[in-house]
């Protein structure tokens, strides 16, 4: 399926943003003695790049960043933080993205409640106040870059 140059550019911007955020979180994870998981080949996933966790309903969700206690390249740890990263050029689909983030993260957090995981979103670009308010009302810590 053909993709427009604008769509491809948006994907590149999103991937660059995610890589930059991962580098910002790396020293935090080290300081807290947490394993930082992100999209990369990991032996405990049989070399699969995708960070995927299962929610309380048995649904699998691909995630951006997970910090794990007692995790390593060869062993999955206990989740201590779930962080999603998103970029939007226009506000048109920002509410949908907020709903997608909360729909993935909240059922996972419920399943790992005993670990008291942090959950947040790093959002760049244009997001409506209602999209931001929804995430905040659901307990997300939100960092907004730009606007």
Sequence positions of predicted segments:
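"Short basic amphipathic alpha-helical interaction patches in structured regions
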Residues: 80, 96-102, 134-138
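Active-site-adjacent loop/helix micro-motif of nuclease/hydrolase catalytic cores
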Residues: 75-77, 89-100, 130
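Active-site metal-binding core of divalent-cation-utilizing nuclease and nuclease-like domains
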Residues: 37-76
């Amino acid at each position: 399926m053909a993709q427009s140059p604008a769509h491809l550019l948006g994907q590149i911007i999103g991937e660059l943003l995610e890589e930059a955020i991962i580098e910002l979180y790396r020293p935090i994870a080290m300081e807290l003695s947490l394993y930082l998981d992100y999209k990369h080949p990991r032996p405990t996933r049989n070399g699969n790049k995708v960070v995927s966790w299962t929610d309380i309903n048995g649904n699998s969700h691909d995630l951006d960043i997970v910090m794990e206690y007692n995790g390593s390249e060869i062993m999955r740890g206990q989740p201590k933080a779930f962080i999603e990263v998103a970029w939007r050029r226009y506000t048109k689909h920002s509410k949908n993205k907020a709903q997608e983030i909360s729909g993935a993260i909240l059922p996972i957090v419920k399943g790992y409640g005993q670990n008291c995981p942090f959950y947040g979103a790093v959002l760049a670009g244009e997001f409506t106040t209602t999209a931001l308010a929804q995430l905040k009302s659901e307990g997300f810590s939100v960092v907004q870059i730009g606007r």
